[in-house]
Amino acid sequence: MSKLAVSSSFSLLCGNCKRGHVGLECYSDVPTNNLLSNEHLHSLESFVNEVSSEWCCHLVDGNTLAIFLPFDQSTWNLSKGAFVSLLEFCEDNLPIKRILLCLNKINVDETVVSCFKYLGFSPLHPHLYPSCIDSQGVFVMVYSM
């Protein structure tokens, strides 16, 4: 399991991402202290890793969790039950209002979009992306709490 890391300008909630993660063109100015307890951070990391060890997440805009999926969809090894558990954990335990799924815009296919729509996600208009997400290269779906 990867270690948690926290930057001074955004929260990196799991250790799978690198600072130069594709899709993050800047970092939000959200203060990271006291947004989530260490217990919540460790639980969130565990839930994300249960879904896929290839996924990573960032806290952006103070009340939004952005989950970055690997750009190579052939590496996805997903558990629907674990993903639903992740959503339930976020709704019940975290002070967030929405979850963003961030996918490589070039590789998005209708099957993936349909699967996430079935779970309650909807496409987010690029004008509504947080400033730290590259609207040119990333397709975002949103789940509102």
From Swiss-Prot:
Highest taxon in the source lineage: Eukaryota
Protein name: Ornithine decarboxylase antizyme
A GO cellular component annotation in the UniProt record: nucleus
Gene3D superfamilies: 3.40.630.60
Subunit structure: Interacts with ODC1 and thereby sterically blocks ODC homodimerization.
Taxonomic lineage: Eukaryota, Metazoa, Ecdysozoa, Nematoda, Chromadorea
Any one GO biological process: viral translational frameshifting
Functional description taken from the UniProt entry: Ornithine decarboxylase (ODC) antizyme protein that negatively regulates ODC activity and intracellular polyamine biosynthesis and uptake in response to increased intracellular polyamine levels. Binds to ODC monomers, inhibiting the assembly of the functional ODC homodimer, and targets the monomers for ubiquitin-independent proteolytic destruction by the 26S proteasome.
A GO molecular-function descriptor: ornithine decarboxylase inhibitor activity
Similarity annotation: Belongs to the ODC antizyme family.
